[in-house]
Amino acid sequence: SAKAVKIESITVDGQNLIIKTTEPNGSLLSSLTEPAFVIMDTADLKDVASKPVLTGPYKITAFKKGETIELAAFADYWGGKLGLDSVTVKDIEDNNKRAMALQSKDVDVIQKVDSANRSLFKDGFNIQDIAGVRVLMLKVNHTEVSPLHDKAVRSAIAHIINYDSMAKIIGNGSTPGAAPFPPSANLGYDAIANKAMTDVAKADQILTQAGYAKNANGMYAKDGKELAVTIAIWGKDTSLYEEIQQELKKAGIAVTLKKLQSPDEVDTLGTDGFDLVERNVVTMSTNDPYWFLSLFYKTGAKANVGGYSNPQVDALIDQLSVTFDQNERSNIAKQAQQILVDDVADIYLLYPSATVVSTTKVKNV
């Protein structure tokens, strides 16, 4: 929205588009590349629901919500002649049905191939695993109603989880998590110190120093109360979280999995409804770190559902919002990441890759 990107007015002067903001906005240009923003001809909106007039190499000729988008090459596209005269995009949400469509050659290219269906395309197909900027993480409840309010508890849990195992369960080129932004974001991943690594002995040491001890049931307890956490999850595939549940139970922490109906419930869950909650987020949807940091880690931000708050992080996010030099922006993001890792602000499980499978006749995807 205009409010989100701090736009006061937009005017046109010949070939110049003049955007006036309400305050300095270092991420303005990046924000305008967000896929949710489009340039649309608003002169005639009678067919906007089925044939909107937009920009780009292809024009929409037909649209059926939840089914298909028919595209035709735009002859006057500034980038020159296109490789295809037309493209049909089919909306197939089910993983198995999508895989079957490619097997039967009803479609030529599919994305979002899960590890269970990957083996179907070993022969006679092209498979590409593309490192993305998405992070699958567990948002932490930092409020006093949760045992994870204690940094020792969240740090111990972060050391118990087997990140290599997490990446293998998801498969398709996924890599183990350890920081807010993946290495592919080019925001100093390798330079971040104290990233969580699997070390159950270290977890035991941390909990022991915090006053926890194992009881007769082999579970950690303090002041007569066993350490137990609730993980709220919403995805269809629960195998990843069942693995975490078993890992924590084996180490001495009881886990209850709380199934949500959709990711939309996360924002309205309330801090009394979880200790950890599943989030799957594109960290650099605009190729800039501001959106992710401000939305998930600024004190009081909507997606900061766990109530994380650190004045240093808030100050860095504020600084990021008014900084225009790209190198400076990257350095600020690196500083914020280091604090988030040191605080165990959240637990970063893995970085999924985008998997694209096509028939052999398709080139240059």
Where are these regions (language model features)?
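Ligand-site clamp/hinge motif
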Residues: K46, F74-S119, A254
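Surface-exposed binding/hinge segments that line
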Residues: S1-D41
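Ligand/substrate-recognition segments at binding pockets and active sites
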Residues: A213-M284, A354
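Detector for C-terminal structural segments
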Residues: I160-Y189, K236-E243, D267-V365
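A structural "hinge/loop" feature
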Residues: G26-V38, K139, V357-V365
